[in-house]
Amino acid sequence: MGLDKDGISNIAKERIASSLVEDTKDLAAELCKHFYNQGWVSGTGGSITLKVLESDVDVQERLIVMAPSGVQKERMLPVDMYVLSSDGTVLSAPPAKGAPHKPPKCSECCPLFLKAYKMRNAGAVIHSHGLESCLATMINPTAKEFRITHMEMIKGIAGHGYYDELVVPIIENSAREYELTDALAAAMEAYPKATAVLVRNHGIYIWGDSWISAKTQAECYHYLFNAALKLHQLGLDPADAKHGPLTRPQTLPDFANKRATSKNVFVLDIEGTTTPISFVTEVLFPYARENVSSFFKSTYNSPETLNDIRLLRDQVHEDLRNNVPGATEIPVESAGIDAVVAAIEKNVQAMIKADRKVTALKELQGHIWRIGYENGELKGSVFEDVPEALAKWDARGIKTYIYSSGSREAQKLIFGNTNFGDLRVYLSGFFDTTIGHKREARSYKEIFLTLGVDHPSCITFATDVLAEAVAAKEAGLQAVLLLRPGNAPLPSDHGFRTAKSLLEL
């Protein structure tokens, strides 16, 4: 089988150039305009993807047409569409446009779309940012499901009738779209009848066995969300068969007591606090350093890796402007994979050697480590007191968060694959440097505002780095320095409380 320089076979090229693909691109562009007029994809948000109707190919193996990210959907043209293989490999990308357009980028929804294709055998997936889909998740900010019954438009949802109760799972939002992938997959597995998943304060993912089914259901879902909002405004219950008056939850008086038991919060550093420094310096960093080249060569055309390359290009451009040692120009794509990967590897090695805390590096390391955890080459390491402390705090209603310079994905991988099992059940959230540098007080102020506690002093931040403790204290947090084996010595006059174990907190 002949392959071109990008590793695309001649057969795949013929499929990409077929009239079926062109027709699907035309349809995708037309639907983008329609959805824009519906208010579902304004501000470049939202997206759509369609399977190419290749009747002689199994649905799971058919080509995928996908709208790009960050593009005005009402001005979308067929040429703007990406063509992907069934596993998400980019086979055809749109040409770059001149200013003021940004370089084309495949939708960050891609990993979520692929889950719907794989788990539901979908023929089309729509991601809407329609206001009603956001507000529907806010009716009850603690609800994990949206429910409605006895409404005519329920009949438009696959597998449902007028008398059925429509249940749509709700997952929590994150700053980056692809971080929702695992939560979306879990919801799809837990709700086998569902044809949609709501994302709180964000929007909805809807799929069907064809574009007609997905579009029809999308229209019905948005209608039903609007209906539920209006029923609530009238004091009526959309989940009641007679849509009678809403009843106040009996547990409401307990809210104050629950708040009292959980008003204090722990925020933990990882390296030198929950995890030995040696694990990071002697295991994680070397693994990432040794696998940069193989990672890029094996995943080069995936949307996630293309985004890694974009972030690295941006960082290198900034480094070159600032004369950062070790920065090397990354050649354009036309130079070929080998040249691009070689330049990327030089830059990444220099960043790792200098222990740079930049997002581009941390995101990439997280993706490389993920492969290591998945194939069993890596296992997270935490001190013996960590699982016991986390379990005790959780039992007392105290929430625990992680704040590390490593990406949130890397943090989840460590705690999801530890020598004591999966500890993520005890953690309420993860912060990385996208919220700010760990040695800057404003970062901790942002964490305080995000967590919603009454006062910064309700937060105890545990770290092994004096400069981080100083920044946290400046923001009003309680700071504790951990004295772990292998940690750097502290000056005698540091002035902070110390602990040798999280159990002492």
Swiss-Prot record:
Record keywords, A-Z: Amino-acid biosynthesis, Hydrolase, Lyase, Magnesium, Metal-binding, Methionine biosynthesis, Multifunctional enzyme, Zinc
Sequence segments annotated as region (Enolase-phosphatase E1): 266-505
An individual GO BP term: L-methionine salvage from methylthioadenosine
Residues reported to bind substrate 2: S404, S405, K438
Domain of life of the native organism: Eukaryota
Pathway the protein contributes to: Amino-acid biosynthesis; L-methionine biosynthesis via salvage pathway; L-methionine from S-methyl-5-thio-alpha-D-ribose 1-phosphate: step 2/6; Amino-acid biosynthesis; L-methionine biosynthesis via salvage pathway; L-methionine from S-methyl-5-thio-alpha-D-ribose 1-phosphate: step 3/6; Amino-acid biosynthesis; L-methionine biosynthesis via salvage pathway; L-methionine from S-methyl-5-thio-alpha-D-ribose 1-phosphate: step 4/6
Pfam families in alphabetical order: Aldolase_II, Hydrolase
InterPro entries the record matches: Aldolase_II/adducin_N (IPR001303), Aldolase_II/adducin_N_sf (IPR036409), Enolase-ppase_E1 (IPR023943), HAD-like_sf (IPR036412), HAD_sf (IPR023214), MethylthioRu-1-P_deHdtase_MtnB (IPR017714), MtnB_viridiplantae (IPR027505), Salvage_MtnB_euk (IPR027514)
Sites where the protein binds substrate 1: C109
Stretch list, region Methylthioribulose-1-phosphate dehydratase: 1-237
A single Gene Ontology CC term: cytoplasm
Reactions the enzyme catalyzes: 5-(methylsulfanyl)-D-ribulose 1-phosphate = 5-methylsulfanyl-2,3-dioxopentyl phosphate + H2O; 5-methylsulfanyl-2,3-dioxopentyl phosphate + H2O = 1,2-dihydroxy-5-(methylsulfanyl)pent-1-en-3-one + phosphate
Record flagged with keyword Lyase: yes
Cofactor: Zn(2+); Mg(2+)
E.C. number: 4.2.1.109, 3.1.3.77
UniProt: Mg(2+) binding residues: D269, E271, D464
Residues the entry annotates as binding Zn(2+): H127, H129, H202
PANTHER family membership: ENOLASE-PHOSPHATASE E1 (PTHR20371:SF1)
Family: In the N-terminal section; belongs to the aldolase class II family. MtnB subfamily. In the C-terminal section; belongs to the HAD-like hydrolase superfamily. MasA/MtnC family.
Record's protein name: Probable bifunctional methylthioribulose-1-phosphate dehydratase/enolase-phosphatase E1
Organism: Physcomitrium patens (Spreading-leaved earth moss)
